[in-house]
């Protein structure tokens, strides 16, 4: 990895850190998911970054990947356990970071501490040549030692330019893999601790999409969506709200359904 690449990764990381710090200032009981999301997006843009992926505000039993809808009227409530997951990119070089907070209470401090300690232990383990299974084992050991369970089917991942989930997945448990980290790799480590069974299931609907490959479509709106995503997001994730903001056309919902594989 050359110095210019490292510089851009670091800049993306600094932007994300400032956005995280800003989010902690504005998230309060009664605040709107949508307005908070828009404010964080504006912050990232003001720092000369762009979005690595839609900002995730995942509350309580929603483990990950919830992003505000077009007319989302959800508000934060006292006692909510909120996972804020965001990232920035500079010329396609990505950052991906997250934290967990409670709204107005502190009843889950041991759970959040378990994930924090697992992250620190994993970072201390990382070096060229280390097996990803060893990283997973460290995460698993720390989380279980605190009385919680790692989520097995959520994981960290390798980062490459314009590719958020590139190549390797970094497990949250010992998956016995012989695969090793190589010098020059960029990775996101994502420990998930739960007081549940340690397995998530997909929701029926999603607001987050990714262009896998262009496909022939008859709908003019669908063609506009393809053109916008290919030009502005390449292979990076995007959300329906961004499509609605940027593709001024009727039938966004129907056209999005036509594009799903």
Residue ranges and their predicted role:
Residues 1-261:
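Active-site neighborhoods and metal-handling regions in enzymes and metal-associated proteins
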């Amino acid at each position: 990895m050359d110095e210019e690449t490292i510089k851009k990764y670091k800049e993306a990381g600094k932007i994300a850190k400032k956005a995280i710090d800003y989010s902690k200032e504005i998230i309060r009981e009664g605040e709107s998911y949508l307005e908070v999301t828009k404010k964080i997006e504006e912050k990232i843009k003001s720092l000369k970054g762009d979005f690595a992926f839609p900002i995730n505000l995942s509350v309580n039993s929603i483990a990950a990947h919830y992003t505000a809808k077009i007319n989302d009227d959800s508000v934060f409530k006292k006692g909510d356990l909120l996972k804020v997951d965001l990232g920035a990119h500079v010329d396609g070089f990505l950052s991906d970071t997250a934290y967990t907070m409670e709204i107005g209470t502190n009843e889950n401090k041991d759970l959040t501490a378990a994930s924090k300690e697992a992250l620190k232990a994993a970072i201390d383990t990382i070096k060229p040549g280390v097996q990803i299974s060893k990283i997973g084992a460290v995460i698993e050991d720390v989380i279980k030692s605190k009385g919680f369970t790692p989520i097995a089917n959520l994981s960290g991942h390798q980062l490459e330019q314009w590719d958020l989930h590139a190549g390797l997945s970094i497990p949250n448990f010992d998956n016995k893999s012989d695969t090793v980290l190589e010098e020059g790799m960029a990775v996101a480590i994502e420990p998930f601790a739960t007081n549940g069974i340690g397995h998530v299931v997909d929701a029926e609907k999603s607001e987050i999409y990714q262009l896998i490959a262009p496909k022939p479509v008859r709908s003019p709106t669908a063609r506009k969506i393809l053109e916008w995503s290919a030009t502005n997001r390449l292979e990076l994730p995007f959300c329906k709200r961004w499509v609605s903001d940027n593709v001024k056309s009727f039938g966004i919902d129907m056209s999005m359904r036509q594009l799903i594989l």
